[in-house]
Amino acid sequence: KGCTPAPPRRAPRLGEHTAEVLTEWRNAGSASPDPVGSPPDEAALPLAGVKILDFMWALAGPAATRMLADYGAEVVRVESASKPDPIRGGRPFVDRRFGPETGALFHSTNASKRMLALDLARPEAREVVLDLVRWADVVCESFTPGAMERMGFGYEALREVNPGLVMLSTSLMGQTGPLSTFSGYGNLSAAIVGFHEMTGWPDREASGPYGAYTDYVAPKFAAAAILAALERRRDSGKGVHLDLSQAEASLHFLAPAMLDVFVNAADPTRCGNRDELLAPHGCYPV
């Protein structure tokens, strides 16, 4: 929304654009780009002056804004006063004391941010949100598609308050399409995308990669998309609504297997601890 999507076309062949990329790189010169936020002093971090309102929760969303905060962006994280973030219960815990303020995973994911708890059922809390939207360069959310609209904070509504707003919506399967309302955590999207089918032993059920795999992949794409949108706004003055499917982002890490299927008609299967390229490779008694 807010920009013209690129027309769909086939994937590039190996080396097809190498000469073009090298020519563009050589012609780019050594000039450093201007910062995307307010002009910082020379000692400031590169994203100093960028202001982000963060409605995200769990891991895949907040990890993206944590990266931007580490590079100097000012991030205000809004959490529900009635439904705390579930990763507050994530291990490990400080001094092995279980509690909403002792979970290391939550604090690691939200370091370098300002935190604010609001009850959006209260009119005064909604006014606080709108004030923050006016302040922000970027609004981020990671709810099931439609949740922000039901709260009255969809992109079109927020754009009326802040016309140049960049908004990122990231969810398991994206904002549109037949699976868009399928909500869950990264282990579910890893299974849907195909990581589980390729991980494990050939004579057993699929086991999948450790953890909620796409939760660790998608934040990098989210952070890059936000930076690209800010650069575009600097050049054009226009905001944009970014739609990031965490499942689609993770497909990039299946690219070798997908190319093997489409180009070589291969049938990737689970191979335990073996490696298709290296030998000997495996776990052996010593």
Task: For the regions a language model picked out, list residue spans one by one.
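Active-site-proximal catalytic alpha-helix in oxidoreductases
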Residues: 217-227, 244-263
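N-terminal helix-loop segment corresponding to the beta1-alpha1 unit
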Residues: 9-241, 270
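Alpha-helical interface/anchor segments and their boundary "cap" residues
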Residues: 264-286
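A glycine-rich dinucleotide-binding beta-alpha-beta segment and adjacent secondary-structure elements
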Residues: 1-6
